[in-house]
Amino acid sequence: MNYKPEIAIIEPNTLCSLGLKSILEEIIPMATIRTFHNFNELMDDTPDMYAHYFISAQIYVEHNAFFLPRKRKTIVLASDLSLIHI
């Protein structure tokens, strides 16, 4: 069996998203990492196929109905700047 995990990064900050993608690709080279700028882009894809979701704090606040049932798969990215909008 050749399982290839898929990881979603949902982050409006392109630089943050690309940096995290680069780190994850080095740590988990067998994984497929996909980036989305907003929640709607994720929903247009196949949202339930991901092994993990890396999301901004703002996206978690706005769409916690989706992420709360998937809390074991969800990693919230937080910084001092993220807290300004909450």
Question: What is each model feature region?
Answer:
Residues 26-65:
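A short, well-structured beta->alpha microelement
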